[in-house]
UniProtKB/Swiss-Prot annotation:
Coiled coil: none annotated. PROSITE patterns: RIBOSOMAL_L22. It comes from Clostridium beijerinckii (strain ATCC 51743 / NCIMB 8052) (Clostridium acetobutylicum). The gene is rplV. GO terms for molecular function: rRNA binding; structural constituent of ribosome. This protein binds specifically to 23S rRNA; its binding is stimulated by other ribosomal proteins, e.g. L4, L17, and L20. It is important during the early stages of 50S assembly. It makes multiple contacts with different domains of the 23S rRNA in the assembled 50S subunit and ribosome. This is Large ribosomal subunit protein uL22. Belongs to the universal ribosomal protein uL22 family. Part of the 50S ribosomal subunit. InterPro entries: Ribosomal_uL22, Ribosomal_uL22_bac/chlpt-type, Ribosomal_uL22_bac/org-type, Ribosomal_uL22_CS, Ribosomal_uL22_sf.
């Protein structure tokens, strides 16, 4: 049995989020929370919330024990991009792309 949680349109680059997800993939849930708590990145705060949601889904919807859960899958996809323009000299305008992320965390019970 698996439980999942998804956070969509997080205003953060998928590249920066992916680095933090690599740290917790395959780890026990308690160990993953400890890693995220001491990781000094903005993405760690968001991933911590998504992981808490996935654990809550497992406990409440599937009645799984939180002590036996591990992070089986976690990945990030690119969300929609906000397009902005930065005015420059002599009437020019440069495009700024503000990327968003869709974060998915899946937890399973160890057999």
């Amino acid at each position: 049995m698996e439980a999942r949680a998804i956070a969509k349109y997080i205003r953060m680059s998928p590249t920066k989020v992916g680095v933090i997800l690599d740290l917790i993939r395959g780890k026990q849930v308690n160990e993953a929370f400890a890693i995220l708590q001491y990781t000094p990145r903005e993405a760690a705060v968001v991933i911590n919330k998504v992981l808490k949601s996935a654990v809550a889904n497992a406990e409440n919807n599937l009645e799984l024990n939180a002590d036996n859960l591990y992070v089986s899958e976690c990945f990030v996809g690119q969300g929609s991009t906000l397009k902005r323009f930065q005015p420059h000299a002599q009437g020019r305008a440069f495009k700024i792309l503000k990327k968003t992320s869709n974060i998915t965390v899946v937890v399973k019970e160890r057999a």
